[in-house]
Amino acid sequence: MRVVVVDLDGVDGADLALERAYERAAALDDGATPATTYARDVRAPGAADGFIGDGATAAMASRTCARAWTALRAGGTVIARGGDAARDAAVLAGFADVVVDATRGVVRGTKPAWARGTAFSLKSRAVRVVTADAGWGADADVDDELIDESALLTELDVNSTAVKYDDCDVGAGKKACKNCTCGRAEAEAAEESANAKSEETFVSACGNCALGDAFRCAGCPYLGQPAFKDTDAVGTKVELDLGDDL
């Protein structure tokens, strides 16, 4: 295991002096160390026992971590002494599992086994459709929606509620046509039969029917008619059609 150590304890805090001390870490200079040289424990420039001294700049820590990343193999570990600058630089460089040992004042990070920029296929996979069971209470042989046949409409219900269209000619009064199919002819025949049955025979009881309405009783069948000869009224049978308006 090769360890690179640069002592910055006796160096002035000026950026120029730190940069010169950094350059003395020849093993981590650009091009001086082949990539993935170290298996583990690359200690970047810093104090004799660690990473970057208290006077190191954030830019210097970032460059050092970047070169340490290049020098490490996949899975290698970097150990450095420092504070927030060392931790942030290690994270930004790509190290994973960066932890801080507050007791020793050391920052430790691991170079992941995967390579940055690794390609992988985004080919979509076939979606598997899983059909869930209906449940323990489901039975394919049971039909819960049976229809009660007694609740169905019968032919009589359909005929009674069917709309009847009036196809007879309309004149002064609606009468059934010759080839009536709407039912008006049957209705008129039934009405005439009812009127014939309701005809009653009346005989004048008061004998004043011929004198006019002033002498007629309230139930006289001649109400509203002019006076006539008495001989025509006596014993005359009058047929009253209850279907007429009196």
UniProtKB/Swiss-Prot annotation:
GO terms for biological process: iron-sulfur cluster assembly. [2Fe-2S] cluster binds at residues 168, 177, 180, 182. A motif (Cx2C motif 1) lies at residues 206-209. InterPro entries: Anamorsin, CIAPIN1. Residues 125-158 are annotated as: Linker. GO terms for molecular function: 2 iron, 2 sulfur cluster binding; 4 iron, 4 sulfur cluster binding; electron transfer activity; metal ion binding. The keyword Cytoplasm applies. Residues 206-220 are annotated as: Fe-S binding site B. Pfam families: CIAPIN1. Its cofactor is [2Fe-2S] cluster; [4Fe-4S] cluster. Residues 168-182 are annotated as: Fe-S binding site A. Coiled coil: none annotated. GO terms for cellular component: mitochondrial intermembrane space. It is found in: Cytoplasm; Mitochondrion intermembrane space. PANTHER family: ANAMORSIN. Component of the cytosolic iron-sulfur (Fe-S) protein assembly (CIA) machinery. Required for the maturation of extramitochondrial Fe-S proteins. Part of an electron transfer chain functioning in an early step of cytosolic Fe-S biogenesis, facilitating the de novo assembly of a [4Fe-4S] cluster on the cytosolic Fe-S scaffold complex. Electrons are transferred from NADPH via a FAD- and FMN-containing diflavin oxidoreductase. This is Anamorsin homolog. It comes from Ostreococcus tauri. The lineage of its organism: Eukaryota, Viridiplantae, Chlorophyta, Mamiellophyceae, Mamiellales.
